[in-house]
Amino acid sequence: MSSKLVLVLNCGSSSLKFAIIDATNGEEHISGLAECFHLPEARIKWKVDGGKQEAALGAGAAHSEALNFIVNTILAQKPALSAQLTAIGHRIVHGGEKFTSSVIVTDDVIQGIKDSIPFAPLHNPAHLIGIAEALKSFPNLADKNVAVFDTAFHQTMPEESYLYALPYSLYKDHGIRRYGAHGTSHFYVSQEAAKILNKPLEELNVITCHLGNGGSVTAVRNGKCVDTSMGLTPLEGLVMGTRSGDLDPAIIFHLHDAMGMSVDQINTLLTKESGLLGLTEVTSDCRYVEDNYATKADAKRAMDVFCHRLAKYIGSYTALMDGRLDAVVFTGGIGENAAMVRELTLDKLGLLGFEIDHERNMAARFGKSGTITKDSSRLALVIPTNEELVIAQDAARLTA
């Protein structure tokens, strides 16, 4: 099978992750991260041929300068690789209801991404910059740019899952509903779980937990998403690094009316100062929480709230499985590495038949997949995610 090299771009508000991946076998030829955009220390790091390199982008540099560097410096050193690029895949955080699957980028698609900016005000504008710069930098691939939406996998949710108990006109007229996030990751690990269990995806019932600085849980029934913990925005649901997740909406009125906080201050509090950071008052890093669980009250407090919330979501989603749950799957930076999070969470779910195997749980870290429960237990798995591969495969498939 001939190679299909795809440039995968993930443009954040202040960073750009990139990789060149062979969609036929998953081989990664180049990968890197440009970060600290709009700051004096803007820089780019990349791996090629097993070696790591780094360079300054110049004070105030952003997406345009980063893509110029990728094209004119990194790829210029690899002309054969550059010549073999067949497509460009773009990760898009929010596609609203318009996009139920990956699509080739057109003017209509660009407009659809713009229309979803209110639901992803930090991410979608950055994605649009990435698309515009890619079209400029690779004119030969102008019709080979593909948008892959984090929300697409969740578009199979039934109405009872995605509607809020608000006036229905807010959904009809303004699109206010649950959309979810991390869909590409939830889809990938569902596929991988089906392979491990030797089942067709359309017969698979799993609960997938993508746990990173942002986190979400998804109920997958017969291979399709039927509910997910993130909502209109990625603020709803689990305790996250700096995000509160679920809370009583009236807290917002109390913060405004009784404590004099502005809407912007409340937004900052809930999105950037809460979660693990808020509970520890030290850090958003789960490694601190895990390392200090036995000795520091702040770490224990944060870990206990985090795992309590996660276990509640897993437990509630078992009600959507039609009487059969094949596995719970952990993925993402925390899901793949924080053995303590997995153990404390599954210990709360003994009623459902989960019993952790300590040795297996400790072995399934740092990029290793595996079963983490005892043979007599209901199954729990660790599966490292690979969103970039899904994006590359979708881009290759749609541009073939």
Curated annotation (Swiss-Prot):
According to UniProt, residues marked as the site described as Transition state stabilizer are H182, R243
Binding, ATP: K17, H210, L211, G212, N213, G214, D285, C286, R287, G333, I334, G335, E336, N337
Q: What is its EC number?
A: 2.7.2.1
Annotated substrate binding sites: R91
Q: Cofactor stoichiometry and binding?
A: Mg(2+). Can also accept Mn(2+).
For the protein in the UniProt heading, the enzyme class is transferase
Task: Quote a single Gene Ontology cellular component term.
Answer: cytosol
**Where does the chain bind Mg(2+)?**
N10, E387
| Compartments, as annotated in UniProt | Cytoplasm
- List, alphabetically, the Gene3D superfamilies matched: 3.30.420.40
Q: In which pathway does it act?
A: Metabolic intermediate biosynthesis; acetyl-CoA biosynthesis; acetyl-CoA from acetate: step 1/2
Q: What is the required cofactor set for this protein?
A: Mg(2+); Mn(2+)
The Gene Ontology biological process annotation of the record reads: acetate metabolic process; acetyl-CoA biosynthetic process
The active-site annotation reads D150
Superkingdom of this entry's organism? Bacteria
GO terms (molecular function) for this protein are: acetate kinase activity; ATP binding; magnesium ion binding
Catalysed reaction(s) here are:
acetate + ATP = acetyl phosphate + ADP
Per the UniProt record, one Pfam family is: Acetate_kinase
Q: Which UniProt keywords apply?
A: ATP-binding, Cytoplasm, Kinase, Magnesium, Metal-binding, Nucleotide-binding, Transferase
Q: Which family does it belong to?
A: Belongs to the acetokinase family.
Q: How does it assemble?
A: Homodimer.
Chain's role = Catalyzes the formation of acetyl phosphate from acetate and ATP. Can also catalyze the reverse reaction.
Record-given protein name: Acetate kinase
The root-end lineage is:
Bacteria, Pseudomonadati, Pseudomonadota, Gammaproteobacteria, Enterobacterales
- Gene expressing this chain: ackA
